[in-house]
Swiss-Prot record:
Keyword presence, Transferase: yes
Swiss-Prot/TrEMBL cofactor(s): pyridoxal 5'-phosphate
Modification N6-(pyridoxal phosphate)lysine, positions: 294
Any single GO CC term annotated in Swiss-Prot or TrEMBL for this entry: cytoplasm
Assembly, per entry: Homodecamer; pentamer of dimers. Binds only one seryl-tRNA(Sec) per dimer.
Pfam families listed in its UniProt record: Se-cys_synth_N (PF12390), SelA (PF03841)
Protein known as: L-seryl-tRNA(Sec) selenium transferase
HAMAP family attached to this UniProt entry: SelA
Keywords: Cytoplasm, Protein biosynthesis, Pyridoxal phosphate, Selenium, Transferase
Superkingdom classification of source: Bacteria
Pathway where it operates: Aminoacyl-tRNA biosynthesis; selenocysteinyl-tRNA(Sec) biosynthesis; selenocysteinyl-tRNA(Sec) from L-seryl-tRNA(Sec) (bacterial route): step 1/1
Amino acid sequence: MSAEAHPLYRQLPAIDRLLNEPEMAPLLAEYGPVLLADTLRQLQAEAREYIGQFHTLADWCADWPAALRQRLNQRQPALKPVFNLTGTVLHTNLGRAPLAESAIAAVTDAMRSAVTLEYSLEGAGRGHRDRAVADLLCALTGAEDACIVNNNAAAVFLLLTVMAAGKQVVVSRGELVEIGGAFRIPDVMRQAGCELVEVGTTNRTHLKDYRQAINENTGLLMKVHTSNYSIEGFTAAVSEQQLAALGQECSIPTATDLGSGSLVDMTRYGLPAEPMPQQLIAAGVDLVTFSGDKLLGGPQAGIILGKKQWIERLQQHPLKRALRADKMTLAALDATLRLYQQPDRLVEQLPSLRLLTRPASEIAACAQRLLAPLIACYGTDFTLDIESCWSQIGSGSLPVDRLPSWALTFTPKDGRGSTLEALTARWRTLTKPVIGRVADGRLWLDLRCLEDEAALLRELAS
C-alpha cells in the first residue's frame, strides 16, 4: 500500500455514522439495519480496494446513500426465474419440471391457510399426511398403498433401510447406477446397512443368477431402471414379472427403482416408451419408487407404491418422519396427479408434457419471428442463424432419445471465445437471465422451452 493512499482511507465514513444520516432513513425503513450494514461493509471493502489500486476515491464515494440504493437494487434472490434455452427440458440445475397452474394455485392456498395436513374431517382427529395423495396414486396405478417422501433418493434409502437392513440385496451388475451428485446404488445400500450381492454381468443377467444368489439372509430382490444410460447389443435382462414370481416363490419381497417414472404411455404423444409404475404393480412387484418432478411433471418428491403390508412398515419407521414431504409438496403433488384423471387434456394442462411434445414446426416458426429483432440488437458483433438441433428430456430420463428442435445461434464476428463468454455473462445479469449453451464456437438458444417470446425480446433488448 503506498503512502499517498493512507489519508484516503481515513476519508471513508464509519458505518454507524452512515446509518444515522437522514438520507438513510428511507432505506432503513425499506430494508432494515442488518442488510444495510452488511451492504455498507461490502461497499467499504470495495472502496479500500479501489484506493489501494488507483490511489484515489471511487466516484460513488461522493454519495453513499445513492451507491447503497443502487447496490441494494442489484441484489438478487437466491432462486431467480430464468429463460431455459439450454435444450434440456427437465434441467436438474434449473429446477426440473415447471408446475401446472392448478398445482401452483394449490401450493399458494396451502401456504396462506391452515390445511388438513394431518387432520381427519371425518373423525375430527389426527389423520395421516400421505393419505389423500396415496388414495389418488392407488386409483391411478392399482397399487394397494403409497408412501410420499421428499425425493426419490430418500425413497430408495427408506425402502432399503426398512426392508433389508442387516440383510442381502440382490441386484444385477448392469443396474448398479450412479445418478447426479454421485448418488450410487452400492453406496446407498451400504449406508442403509444392506449387503449388496451382484449377479450376472454388465450386459447379461438371467433369472438363474438371482435364484442362485438367494439364501437365508436375502432380504430383497431389486431391479434399478437404468434411466440415465442404455446398454445395447448382446444383452439379456430379467423382467419385473419374472423377478416378482421368483420373489413370491421364495417369500422374498421385490422392489424396482424406476427413477423417472411416468403415469402415462409416452408413446401416445410420439415420445419413446418409458416403464410405468402401474405396469410394475400389475407384474407383481412389491414396491416401486420414482420421482415426482421428472416425467410426472410435479414437485420434487419420492413416491413409493406397493403392497399395503410393506408400505405400512415404511410409514411406521422413524426415518419416514425425517424424510416426509411438507404441505406445499403434497398440495402440488395432489393437484398434479388430478390432471392425470383427464388424460386427453394432459398436454394442455401439464407444462412439462406440453414442452416435450411441442412440434418442431412450431419451434421453427418461433425462431423465424425472433430472428430479425435480435439481428437488430446483436447483428453488429454476431452473425445470427436459425439451425436445427436436438433437445433432450433431461434429469436422466430417456438418455439416448432426442427431440427435434430449432435454435437461434450467435457466432462472434471476431471469432473470439471471449466475446461469447462476455455475452453469456451479461445475459446472466439480466432481470430474468437467459441461459443457453455454447457449442462449436457458437451460442445456441434452443427455443423448445420458450413460451413468452415478447418477454425474451424485452430482456435481450435491454
